[in-house]
């Protein structure tokens, strides 16, 4: 959907004129209101096509069929995109969303909980170990603080990773885009 909207915003692609607000609203609603029933419909189409991305393409064509403006350019829904272009970008978006909405918030909660334990047990003595052998005295709080600092460092590294995708055709040379 976003690909089709982007095509309509390119002056150089005259075959896909700029969409009206109504057509853009319809496309936005397909994304925003995507339902389990929609997913079932795609799986139903896929049983015929034996191709996941082609099933999504046909589903989108069904959704825009009653809009004359979008129906007129529906062959551009999959224009210049291989299935891998679509899939890897989808996977990248899903991974990024999972990282931002699930993983990092959970790790933040974990860091906070371990930091609280470090404060709570800051005076509780324990024997530190090195190579599995008793070493020197420390506190449970200090050891928990070490874990929190190390986890925070790893969290920052995970957050800094750029999750990328590609959209450059079957062999990466943009031939379909020319």
State where each predicted segment sits.
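A helix-coil-helix interface module used to build multimeric assemblies
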Residues: 1-177
């Amino acid at each position: 959907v976003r690909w089709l909207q982007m095509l309509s915003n390119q002056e150089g692609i005259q075959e896909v004129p700029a969409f009206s607000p109504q057509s853009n609203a319809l496309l936005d609603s397909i994304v925003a209101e995507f339902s389990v029933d929609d997913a079932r419909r795609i799986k139903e189409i896929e049983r015929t096509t034996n191709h996941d991305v082609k099933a999504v393409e046909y589903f989108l064509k069904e959704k825009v069929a009653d809009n004359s403006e979008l129906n007129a350019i529906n062959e551009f829904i999959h224009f210049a995109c291989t299935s891998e272009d679509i899939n890897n970008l989808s996977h990248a978006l899903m991974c990024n969303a999972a990282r931002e909405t699930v993983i990092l918030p959970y790790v933040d909660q974990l860091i906070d909980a371990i930091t609280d334990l470090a404060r709570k047990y800051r005076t509780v003595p324990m024997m530190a170990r090195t190579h599995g052998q008793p070493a020197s005295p420390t506190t449970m709080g200090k050891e928990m603080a070490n874990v929190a600092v190390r986890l925070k460092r790893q969290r920052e590294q995970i957050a800094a990773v750029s999750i990328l995708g590609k959209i450059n055709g079957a062999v990466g040379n943009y031939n379909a885009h020319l």
